[in-house]
């Protein structure tokens, strides 16, 4: 699905970092280093970005037209 706007635990804004994070990780950078560079320090926010699975393209095939 879509990345949540805020961290579930602390409420910090994380959605603005998602595109930069995923682009750099797909380019081969270390995810921990990328999170450090983006300023994501709290482990709750880090797990939000590290554990997110983007499945919107798979789920959209199962929606019914309104």
UniProtKB/Swiss-Prot annotation:
Record Pfam families: RNA_pol_N
Gene Ontology terms, MF aspect: DNA binding; DNA-directed RNA polymerase activity; zinc ion binding
EC number: 2.7.7.6
A single Gene Ontology CC term: DNA-directed RNA polymerase complex
Binding note for cofactor: Binds 1 zinc ion.
Reactions catalysed: RNA(n) + a ribonucleoside 5'-triphosphate = RNA(n+1) + diphosphate
Compartment annotation: Cytoplasm
Origin superkingdom: Archaea
Subunit-level organization: Part of the 13-subunit RNA polymerase complex.
Protein name as it appears in the record: DNA-directed RNA polymerase subunit Rpo10
Organism: Saccharolobus solfataricus (strain ATCC 35092 / DSM 1617 / JCM 11322 / P2) (Sulfolobus solfataricus)
Name of the encoding gene: rpo10
